[in-house]
Amino acid sequence: MERAGICHSDGFDLAYRIEGEGAPILVIGSAVYYPRLFSSDIKQKYQWVFVDHRGFAKPKRELRAEDSRLDAVLADIERMRTFLQLEDVTILGHSGHAFMALEYARTYPKQVRKVALFNTAPDNSEERQRKSESFFMETASLERKKRFEKDIENLPQDIDKDPERRFVHMCIRAEAKSFYQERPHAAALWDGVFTNMPIIDELWGNTFARIDLLQRLADVRMPVYIGLGRYDYLVAPVSLWDAVDGLYPHVDKVIFEKSGHQPMLEEPEAFDQSFRKWLDQ
């Protein structure tokens, strides 16, 4: 099997990158962005398969309305899994990709051994986003709030200059909400990442707003790991997930106390220890 390449799926060139050996972990999102988040140590312990979905892939044809449907994305993931001859995978979704990961496990349960969901809220509704914003304003330090206000002021001009990368610009300008500690070079994580904005807009803006992960967890029987950052103000507060405690015995919830939206990058040792323990169970 090639360690990197392209899988052609329904008019999209989906990139993949494979690192390490062992039990397969299928990481949904960008094959450029996500390998940068995880430590070299944990990437040696398992077979990490980083794959694009069509929101991060250049289309080979004109976009159609159905290209933004979640079931089309799930079909891409299944096509990639078949193409790479992967079996019995742990499927991993971070942030909005957690919705994709759990939906894939619900749709293709025979192909999934475990599910890992990181740094997401149970839904992406406007009401939940307002709660997250209120939590930030009520609990964040004055220094953090000032830094966010300063950074976000530059977002409109970033988008004016490069509207097709507005998703990336929003992620970069929200750094004060994303990281426990300031990371001056965090923008480099997004270097070379293509964004297919019509698809991202539909999924993040509409589809994920209608999905309640707390309810969908009842539909899967395989083990689920939910990893959260205490200072992840993008999807705060972590108490949004309190309902899983005692309700779902197949779900393990872990809160990383000195992390924001990327605990695998911010607390690599604690992350690796916790995640490896769960993977090896």
Swiss-Prot record:
Q: Locate the AB hydrolase-1 domain: which residues?
A: 30-268
The active-site annotation reads 95, 232, 261
**What keywords were assigned to this record?**
Hydrolase
Pfam families the record matches: Abhydrolase_1 (PF00561)
Example of a GO cellular component annotation carried by this entry:
membrane
**Superkingdom of origin organism:** Bacteria
Similarity comment: Belongs to the AB hydrolase superfamily.
Q: What is this protein called?
A: AB hydrolase superfamily protein YclE
Q: Which organism is it from?
A: Bacillus subtilis (strain 168)
- Gene symbol here is yclE
